[in-house]
Amino acid sequence: MKFTVHVKPNSRKKAVEMCEDGSLRVYLSAPPIEGRANEQLIEVLATHFGKAKREISIVAGRKRKMKIVEIV
């Protein structure tokens, strides 16, 4: 399944929220430098959905705050 994800890097909390339109808003403590926020995004989503990190991939938006993420 694919999700549109709105990433909020440099947040005080790490959390996942479901938006009304079916997308996810994910708060990350990592900065958007050298892929750190992307790595933490995969970790947070893996924990949230109970999946392994290898089952989650960023399909589009690696360098943007709005991403499309696929979960196998």
Predicted regions and their residues:
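Contiguous, often N-terminal, cationic amphipathic patches that form binding interfaces
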Residues: M1-G35, E39-I42, K51-K53, S57-V72
